[in-house]
Amino acid sequence: MKVFSLILIAFVANAYCDEGASTEKEEKMGTIIGIDLGTTYSCVGVFKNGRVEIIANDQGNRITPSYVAFSGDQGERLIGDAAKNQLTINPENTIFDAKRLIGRFYNEKTVQQDIKHWPFKIVDKSNKPNVEVKVGSETKQFTPEEVSAMVLTKMKQIAESYLGHEVKNAVVTVPAYFNDAQKQATKDAGSIAGLNVVRIINEPTAAAIAYGLDKKDGERNILVFDLGGGTFDVSLLTIDSGVFEVLATNGDTHLGGEDFDQRVMEYFIKLYKKKSGKDLRKDNRAVQKLRREVEKAKRALSTQHQTKIEIESLFDGEDFSETLTRAKFEELNMDLFRATLKPVQKVLEDADMKKTDVHEIVLVGGSTRIPKVQQLIKDYFNGKEPSRGINPDEAVAYGAAVQAGVIGGVENTGDVVLLDVNPLTLGIETVGGVMTKLIGRNTVIPTKKSQVFSTAADSQSAVSIVIYEGERPMVMDNHKLGNFDVTGIPPAPRGVPQIEVTFEIDVNGILHVSAEDKGTGNKNKLTITNDHNRLSPEDIERMINDADKFAADDQAQKEKVESRNELEAYAYQMKTQIADKEKLGGKLTDEDKVSIESAVERAIEWLGSNQDASTEENKEQKKELESVVQPIVSKLYSAGGQGEQASEEPSEDHDEL
């Protein structure tokens, strides 16, 4: 008997099925813009006149710093270049890195580490990190969503100035490894900015669209390596005649250019203290002056082998002058550079591909300009040169603009179909604490899967649907997302009621779960939103690593539970059959009936007193029960009862809740 046997519905829906009503879409939604909301810089584009336009801001720059500042006695709000330019004179009231806070909790390790380096104050509000700044004479707190909304407002204004009319709809990109809470928070930021976020898409996927739009030469496997200011993503996609299918994704939502800057900052702060005996950290302005010059030096080292960092009157009126070589920069960050290769290896494993199967390597994000990063990737792929026909700063916004054009029904966007994936396995708890999978890791989304379950006890009037994500076979090793109950189930023997559980992931990667009692029509549902504690990227990585590390233990535990479930189901099934006079019960002699009843009762009693029995012990007990049942059933067949053969076996089996 198989415990996991019935999947009623399993289908993948294409995100785009109506390209016909293009004019109707445009009139209904208006112009849809594409926004790359970055940790350090943001970028906006629009599909117009048959091509993508990356829109320059009021300073003439095609990328805009993701900075917000409040300055002067009136608390004037500055966003973008104006905010970043006054960072060194107003560090406490200049906010950046909101993307490193969005959708996170105050007590997360990464948040606590970042707080040490930021000049602005972070306060704990119900375990949500809020930014506290002076706005004129008042002290105000802003959520990360509000700060991100201010940046999105700036990007909206940049687009409106160029287009000459109001914009209400946008496609916004997020790192591939953003969890549900972070995606929801990004959508909330759009709403705060007055934008309807019609679609959230993954940054490396957007970059692949930018790269692959004009590629018509058959199926290609594309590895997108996206290393930005604060996040890192790797995605492996196939592109074939305008269909973009994400095969696997991995990354670190807390690794990027700012981490490289921080290593150099710490080096110079220690060096300065060693030479002068003074601690730069005591002066916020001095630290931000150093931060600005270190970032400039890092950029310079992408094209030259050494650069000089000179800052007038850095601390206590003293000037600062030091040389930074490319070799020193690489030494300070080599472990971080090498850490980027692990997700590359993981996506290849997940997609079941070899290095030689990758046709193109696409580099995205400003940090991929670092020569050592380029060299490590080239060496990893045995000397294969990454593609260079794409601007790493603009690629994500470019792809988002194409996607916006497709959704808006703009002509000449080409036959683009985007098939993205969810990053973790999703399932529910069944008898014995087993994680029963409904949607597997790296399944193409949007998707919808259903499975029928049943009750674990006689006359059970309610079932609890407990939802988990993770890669381990037992729920205790995975992460709980939420739970709800289906009640009002009419009294019936165990295994009879049919409860259909449906998991649906929408185009934005957000999970909706419903359950319905097929007998009564009673149903309940749950949407996993920002209020449910979704996993941090660290937890995701730990779970996947744990799943690899403890695979043998997991399998043994799973087999133990399954063997117990099989014995229990077989025993109760036989008990039901011999009690039914229309089936087996009506065909047996009294002596045979007593023999089977006694064997069944012994098995049930043994189960009750041996909760932690091994797989072998469970299997041995099942064999003992079968040794009593099978000769009697065989005797019936030979006496002409073959027509009833199927009655001894179950017609359908459902996992029990």
Swiss-Prot record:
Pfam families: HSP70
Keywords: ATP-binding, Chaperone, Endoplasmic reticulum, Hydrolase, Nucleotide-binding, Signal, Stress response
Residue ranges, annotated region (Nucleotide-binding (NBD)): 128-282
Primary subcellular site in the record, as a coarse category: endoplasmic reticulum
Stretch forming the signal peptide: 1-17
Region (Disordered): 607-657
Annotated localization: Endoplasmic reticulum lumen
Entry-linked CDD domains: ASKHA_NBD_HSP70_BiP
Induction: By endoplasmic reticulum stress.
Domain of life: Eukaryota
Residues where ATP binds: 38-41, 99, 229-231, 295-302, 366-369
One GO cellular component term noted in the UniProt record for this chain: cytoplasm
Region entry Substrate-binding (SBD), spans: 402-502
Enzyme class at the top of the EC tree: hydrolase
Functional description taken from the UniProt entry: Endoplasmic reticulum chaperone that plays a key role in protein folding and quality control in the endoplasmic reticulum lumen. Required for ER dynamics during the first embryonic cell divisions. Specifically, controls ER transition into sheet-like structures at the onset of mitosis, possibly by regulating homotypic membrane fusion.
Family: Belongs to the heat shock protein 70 family.
UniProt-recorded name of the protein: Endoplasmic reticulum chaperone BiP homolog
Record organism: Caenorhabditis elegans
